């Protein structure tokens, strides 16, 4: 197959065309069915987490080890010498790029991954999250999970709940699903955490249906995917947070009118926004979603680092 992802930076989901997304999803399914433990043998990949992470970092590292590659790097940028010495991000990336075949980066500054790509000496950059901006590999595993559970990425009704203003996962997911035809979006959030206008304007420009709703109950019988996110306490004043915490919680009783095919996703960590009782329903899919991150990240790593694939 033609591999247009070879040596490509994975900075934003917007950098990937629909056919490239489909290429990653097909490769993800292939690797889930048939492991390829030596696919990236002799490759060395840097894992540079300037911001703390558990799931994303461990998922990437597991993907790397299962492909036979080696990994170097750090998991807490605040405790490494380059931060204490005041070295710039660009200098750090320039040096690290001379050691490795690719760099995974998470950084609190928006735009940091694209900046890193300018100084990586043509070594591919994988964005593992840059501030509130983008988280493309989370989106790839989300798409893989949606396709796996719904057998399609078109003609879906998707409800997205929680922090839609600062949540980079929901921005990337909406942009990705907008590449596929006839999807509809239902946005549910506190007024202070509404989806940014640039996302709404993008949907309007593409003539894609979207609407704000006040609660999950209003739309539970209409949706195929319920994508929950946590509301961060520091984003709201105490009164707003108390109201949001009670209003935007998914309880098992709400699911009585759900479609049989409906699945609940969450980028994790889950705090209070999904009751533990929901875990035992057939709709709960967030832990299987997290497990799919290994296959999606294996797929994108291998497609970027190896030109020819069967």
Curated annotation (Swiss-Prot):
Q: What does the record give under GO molecular function?
A: amino acid binding; aspartate carbamoyltransferase activity
Q: Which reaction does it catalyse?
A: carbamoyl phosphate + L-aspartate = N-carbamoyl-L-aspartate + phosphate + H(+)
Source species, domain of life: Bacteria
Q: Name one GO biological process term.
A: 'de novo' UMP biosynthetic process
Record keywords, A-Z: Pyrimidine biosynthesis, Transferase
Which pathway does the database say it acts in? Pyrimidine metabolism; UMP biosynthesis via de novo pathway; (S)-dihydroorotate from bicarbonate: step 2/3
Q: Which Pfam families match?
A: OTCace, OTCace_N
User: Which HAMAP family is this protein grouped with?
Assistant: Asp_carb_tr
Q: How does it assemble?
A: Heterododecamer (2C3:3R2) of six catalytic PyrB chains organized as two trimers (C3), and six regulatory PyrI chains organized as three dimers (R2).
Q: Which NCBIfam families match?
A: asp_carb_tr, PRK00856.1
Functionally, this protein is described as follows: Catalyzes the condensation of carbamoyl phosphate and aspartate to form carbamoyl aspartate and inorganic phosphate, the committed step in the de novo pyrimidine nucleotide biosynthesis pathway.
What's the protein here called?
Answer: Aspartate carbamoyltransferase catalytic subunit
Lineage per the UniProt record: Bacteria, Pseudomonadati, Pseudomonadota, Gammaproteobacteria, Enterobacterales
Gene responsible for this protein = pyrB
């Amino acid at each position: 197959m033609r591999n247009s992802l070879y040596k490509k930076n994975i900075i934003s989901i917007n950098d990937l065309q629909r056919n490239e997304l489909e290429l990653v999803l097909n490769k993800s399914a292939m690797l889930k069915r048939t492991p390829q433990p030596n696919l990236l043998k002799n490759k060395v990949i840097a894992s540079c987490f300037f911001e703390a992470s558990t799931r994303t970092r461990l998922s990437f590292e597991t993907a790397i080890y299962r492909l036979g590659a080696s990994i170097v790097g750090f998991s807490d940028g605040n405790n490494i010498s380059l931060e204490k010495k005041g070295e710039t991000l660009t200098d750090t990336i320039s040096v690290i790029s001379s050691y490795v075949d690719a760099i995974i980066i998470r950084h609190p500054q928006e735009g940091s991954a694209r900046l890193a790509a300018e100084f990586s000496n043509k070594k591919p950059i994988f964005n593992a999250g840059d501030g509130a901006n983008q988280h493309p590999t989370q989106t790839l595993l989300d798409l893989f999970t949606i396709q796996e559970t719904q057998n399609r990425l078109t003609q879906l009704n998707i409800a997205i709940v929680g922090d839609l203003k600062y949540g980079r996962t929901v921005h990337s997911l909406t942009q990705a699903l907008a590449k596929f035809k006839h999807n509809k979006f239902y946005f549910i959030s506190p007024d202070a955490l509404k989806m940014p206008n640039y996302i709404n304007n993008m949907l309007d420009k593409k003539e894609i249906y979207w609407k704000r709703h006040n609660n999950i109950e209003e739309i539970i019988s209409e949706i195929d995917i319920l994508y929950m996110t946590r509301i961060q306490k520091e984003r709201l004043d105490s009164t707003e947070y108390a109201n949001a915490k009670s209003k935007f919680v998914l309880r098992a009783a709400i699911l009585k009118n759900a479609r049989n095919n409906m699945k609940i996703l969450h980028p994790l960590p889950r705090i209070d926004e999904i009751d533990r009782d929901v875990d035992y329903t057939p709709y709960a899919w967030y832990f299987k979603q997290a497990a799919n991150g290994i296959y999606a990240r294996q797929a994108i790593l291998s497609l970027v680092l190896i030109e020819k694939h069967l």
